Amino acid sequence: MLKRWILTLFVVCLGFSQVAKAELELVITEGIDSARPIGIVPFKWHGEGKLPQDISAIISSDLQRSGKFSPVATNKMPQTPYKDSDINYEAWTKMGVDAIVTGEVKLNAQGKYEVTYKLIDVVRGQLTKGQSKALDESGKLVLTRDHILVNKVASLSTKQLRKYAHRISDVVYEKLTGERGAFLTRIAYVVVNDKAQYPYQLRIADYDGYNERLVLKSKQPIMSPAWSPDGKKLAYVSFENRKSQIFIMNIYTGKRELIASYPRHNGAPRFSHDGDKLAIVLSKSGSLQIYVVDLKTKKMSQITRGRANNTEPFWAPDNKSLIFTSDRGGKPQIYRVNLGDGSTKRLTWQGSQNLGGQITPDGKYIVMVNRSETGFNLAKQDLETGAVQVLTKTLLDESPSIAPNGGMVIYSSIYRKQNVLSMVSIDGRFKARLPATNGRVRAPAWSPFL
């Protein structure tokens, strides 16, 4: 039963398109009215024509996708100041906005873009009129202007503008939430285009679909990409030699290393969080079983045994246990195995099937594919209480992958009879999809912090 399900999952675990500025166009499908309002004021451009990148629009989109912020539309802003001295604090606080981002861009003498931005605490600014004071080390009363939370300047090339906009988003997100932002991360995914010379393509892009790059192309299936913790390598399954094999590839040099090429099935690679080991699934002894390969010594240890099929391993944050999918109870459910003593515990009970589990970076939740009367949808389970929350309402969801800060999940779903990538915030309130312009997109993997 599980073996048939795994084969079906592998056969469709493919998809993608051609090189372009953004092959994946992110479309918001469900926003958040109750998210925290924030003002991302259009950056003032001191130059001719248009900026190559709309920095404020990128920041606004990033923060909205996090599910925690609701940027005020430009046409609804009470004003569009680019200097903190021009801010009408009362006008912003009346809208419920407690923070705004302002900035300006100009060309410097070296021909680069000089970007200046500030993150401003509107409430603090209203209380102090922007003129807060405090005693310095010598006991002298000085102007602190502590309503300005961030004040930075950078000199950038045209190619660096978009990346720096994501950097600003990371800074703003962390300053206001206390959590690290994940807007400078990437996603890897597989695309299949039946009409292409090489139908199967492994690609990477910025988390929002921009700056897409081809990593590998093949006439045979590619599936199950997984990032190394340093973001430099991808493990994946290839059928290029007419059988399943597991490789690790350096995405910058293209150098590959063959990890597993045993009889029958080789699949589901997953790096440990320290990068020293790789969990894989083999069927060389009959049923699907989980093994761990030491990447330095190449020594391999078998983790699961028995007649049941065990697959989809994922490491706990402390690397001391794995969660995995098993049909030992009749239908696929998620279990945890202690790597020290081999003890195993079933974790999921709600829903006829639960599979594809991943643990959030803080170790508090499992995100998984949950089958219920409504179909296959993503769900989140609290590991302490066992409470389950269904996160999505899309069709035939699979392959969830969690952002390194735990704030968002990317996954594969069906939209208009086509495989697309979709996103959902970890609380289920914000949803978006990234339909490709050409090809079927599957098997997403969110990178670590880069």
Curated annotation (Swiss-Prot):
Pfam families: PD40, TolB_N. The keyword Ubl conjugation does not apply. GO terms for cellular component: periplasmic space. It is found in: Periplasm. GO terms for biological process: cell division; protein import. Its main location: periplasm. Residues 1-22 form the signal peptide. Gene3D superfamilies: TolB, C-terminal domain, TolB, N-terminal domain. Keywords: Cell cycle, Cell division, Periplasm, Signal. Part of the Tol-Pal system, which plays a role in outer membrane invagination during cell division and is important for maintaining outer membrane integrity. Belongs to the TolB family. The Tol-Pal system is composed of five core proteins: the inner membrane proteins TolA, TolQ and TolR, the periplasmic protein TolB and the outer membrane protein Pal. They form a network linking the inner and outer membranes and the peptidoglycan layer. This is Tol-Pal system protein TolB. The lineage of its organism: Bacteria, Pseudomonadati, Pseudomonadota, Gammaproteobacteria, Vibrionales.
